[in-house]
Amino acid sequence: MLTSKEKSDTKRLPMMPIRDVVIFPYMMTPFVVGRESSVRALEEAMAGDKKIFLATQHDASIDEPKPNEIYSVGTIVNIVQSLKLPDGNIKVLVEGVERAKVVSVADDEGFFRATVRTSGFKVETGPQLDALISRVTTLFEQYVKLSQNLNYETMVAAIRVDEPGKLADTVGANLQLTIEEKQELLEIFDPIDRLTRVAEMLDIEIEKLNVDRTIQGRVKRQMEKAQKEYYLNEKIKAIQKELGRGEKSEIDELKRRIEEAGMTADAQEKAMAELKRLENMPPMSAESTVSRNYLDWLLAVPWKKKSKEIRDLKFAEGVLEADHYGLEKIKERILEFLAVRRLVKNPKGSILCFVGPPGVGKTSLGMSIAKATGRKFVRMSLGGVRDEAEVRGHRRTYIGALPGQIIQMMKKAGTRNPVFMLDEVDKMSMDFRGDPSAALLEVLDPEQNFMFVDHYLDVEYDLSQVFFVATANVMHTIPAALQDRMEVIRLSGYTELEKMEIAKRFLVKKQIEATGLDSKQIDFQDDGINSLIQYYTREAGVRNLEREIGNVCRKVARQVVNAESGKDKKAPAKAVINGDKVPELLGPWKFRDLVVEKKNEIGAATGLAWTEVGGQLLTVECTLMEGKGKLTITGKLGEVMQESAQAAMSYIRSRAMSLGIPRDFYRNLDLHIHIPEGAIPKDGPSAGITLATTICSALTKIPVRGDLAMTGEITLRGKVLPIGGLKEKLMAAHRHGILEAIMPKENEKDLPDIPDAIKKTMKLHFVESMDEVLKIALEREIVALPIPGAELPVEAGKPAEETVAH
């Protein structure tokens, strides 16, 4: 263990505060004295034994520090030399003698006089001390070699010192430390502790210098590389100049391409101006890269190239029939468009919007249109887009700016007249960066899109030859102004017969090929496909049907592989997929026919609803409890549906006696109406007659027919108003096995849109009033109650207009 013994002494000396420097013992330091108090202290020392106590002040900005603003530990120094300067200041050279700690300070005729205590330590030598001295010496050698601020003589002088205290002070004085770190070292009186601390500081400083040297080396290499590249580029330019080629030829090539691009006059003028700027720029500058990118984009966009259109209606009809089954209205509209193109020389592009549930073929229709017309096809997905710059691009002032997706897709198409699909146009949103749907207003307006301006290109670009096709699941999320610019064509879901044909013509072949099978290994029969449609999928489109066909094919593929490897010797040579085989492969049915076990029930009726995924059945339940006429409505219903329930309740109360219900029934009863699947939001007025029928059934105790569905809005006077989505609703009823439906009389005009398969198999009742609804929907006829005081009895089936006043 390293040890040292202390002996102390007290002295009284003139004191001088110093700034931005810490004086160590054995250290020769010159500095200038200018403060009046410091000059007096210096003169006092010079008049005596030339010894003065120097201590660093805490804050160098203070001109006349107080004793408590000066560090308490400083150094007693000898004044070696003193020289008075012409400006009145004194330049002195001092040598540190020993460190001392202030005991007390007195103000003595304009300067400080301090009583200080010195501490002398006697160090016991030994191998541990020798090892510490050797370590510090070695570290200091490394430090001097790494540092550019110390010379070799300093290192030699330090190495020759064998006294630990003197070595610590010599090394500490030469380290690049802060004032605080040097003061900390000065305040350590024990030489062994001080030397140990110096060793720690040397380790840290060497690490810093190593990191600094690594960084400097990396920077130097990069600079050398940049200088080398610059030199080589200049040399290449000189060689090319000598050969008569080079940058000039590149500028000439760009100029030729601009002239041949077929740009508008405005765009060509802007391109030429940018080319002139590029010519005057240094080739290695960042701005030249920006200009070059801009010119590349201007030249990449198709200005005059057009696809040669196919205007043969028979060919187009054949393509559409081959790719899609059904969808007659859409096919007619596309063929009408082609007929117009054939008759008119320069017609404007069309803007169609396909609206329908998922999986009915909206996106694939766009590809078929491109194929039928001989045009290129590009697709831009708008789902989740909420930045206007996605459509119009960023201005060139931004770093990394690019054109918007419209221009990027036109570049991808390579022609002025592609079929441009704007997919999921109903799923755009907006935020602080703008509204992309507002940017689309210009794109989809035939009166404006011939001069569409992208923020990046900043020139007018003609989109009038583009055939725009938008797709959406619902219309209500699309802004009205955008709806107004598009011709909306609605795609309903497919009937079971249509799904059967689609599966046989397209899906089965596609999945057999995708799984590596062939017609010799698997055979889908009609009852097998029908089983998949009825019991494993329940959708408006055919996506899930294709998925289930794929599941069957994969399971058969596994059986084929096992049979070939000898693992499954019982596997048949050809898998026949029929109604019995499907459950073996896919497990139990996922969906059951809801009507098979459904009986007529009191207070429960089946309604029809329309959602963005197609038509759906809606069960409405009503129950009675003792109470005071409170109406509770549950099932996550929207405001419109809740108001429909209130209207239905008011109608029942106003017609209570004629419906066989006591007039004051509500005084003693509470009604609770519930629509199951409470987690799913429901809204709309079309459940009005279903709600009224359910309430009437619960109050009269007459069951509602279970094999019947209904839809229609109700008024307070009992009239039945028309609804929307009739085709989808009837298809949902047909899909669930319900073959009888009640609907408003005014919806009879929609019958031509209903598939023939549904009209032939379903019995449709068109009604005008609730009385007609109740006659059809309830199991038996209502018997009216006699009205007290009335001359004539009220008959059941009384017209809805004659309401009872309360």
From Swiss-Prot:
> Which PROSITE patterns does the annotation name?
LON_N, LON_PROTEOLYTIC, LON_SER
Which sites bind ATP?
356-363
Q: Which BP terms does GO give this entry?
A: cellular response to heat; protein quality control for misfolded or incompletely synthesized proteins
Answer whether the UniProt record assigns the keyword Cell membrane to this protein: no
Q: Where in the cell is it found?
A: Cytoplasm
Reaction catalysed by this enzyme: Hydrolysis of proteins in presence of ATP
Instruction: State the InterPro entries in the record.
Output: AAA+_ATPase (IPR003593), ATPase_AAA_core (IPR003959), Lon_bac (IPR027543), Lon_bac/euk-typ (IPR004815), Lon_lid (IPR054594), Lon_proteolytic (IPR008269), Lon_Prtase (IPR027065), Lon_prtase_N (IPR003111)
Give the keywords, sorted. Answer: ATP-binding, Cytoplasm, Hydrolase, Nucleotide-binding, Protease, Serine protease, Stress response
Active-site residues from the entry: 686, 729
Q: Which residues form the Lon N-terminal domain?
A: 13-206
Q: Name one GO molecular function term.
A: ATP binding
Q: Which family does it belong to?
A: Belongs to the peptidase S16 family.
Q: What is this protein called?
A: Lon protease
Q: Which organism is it from?
A: Solibacter usitatus (strain Ellin6076)
Report the gene name: lon
